[in-house]
Amino acid sequence: MNDASPASGTPVLDVWCELQCPDCRSALDDLRALRARYGDRLELRLRHFPLEKHKHAFAAAQAAEEALEQGKGWEYVEAVLGRVEELDRAGEPFLVEVARELGLDAEEFDTALVDGRHILIVDADQAEGKAIGVTGTPTYVIDGERLDGGKSQEGLRERVAEIVDRLLAGQG
């Protein structure tokens, strides 16, 4: 998932995430800090990696793609991650409610979840993640380097920043 269209040569941080994952919620602060620091000089790209242990994760990934299609991908992701417990309790109706709260077309959202129009995107992300060794979320990939998050987020923001700074310095 990618809301932006960065200039070519912009470093890309792939964020393998799952919207029912408490560790991904914790990682939001790091992602916000990286966006604040780099702005358009870093492309953050959400990659879906729904885990079987979270029963609403696959639907949430599809919902995030529908939100992207309607123009509010990252806003939606942040809203859902900020309320993981509600997703745990309410499931798909919660996903549609968040869309409504953000001013998205909730009816179209519901239809997208029923007809599965975004399943192939989610499946492709998950397959690619498995192929490169992603086993849990969050996992970051930048410049070919995989950085595993999960319960130990400490130091990841700094490590990503080191790599981005190195890549940006190489462009000058």
Spell out what each predicted region is.
Residues 2-9:
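Short beta-strand-to-loop junctions in surface cap/lid or active-site-entrance loops
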Residues 2, 50-52, 148:
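Generic, ordered loop/turn and secondary-structure boundary motif
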Residues 10, 16, 23-36, 97-172:
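C-terminal cap of thioredoxin/glutaredoxin-like
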Residues 5, 53-55, 138, 151:
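Solvent-exposed, flexible loop/coil residues
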Residues 8, 50, 63, 82-85, ...:
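A general structural-boundary detector
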Residues 12-100, 170:
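Structural alpha/beta surface segment adjacent to cysteine/selenocysteine redox centers
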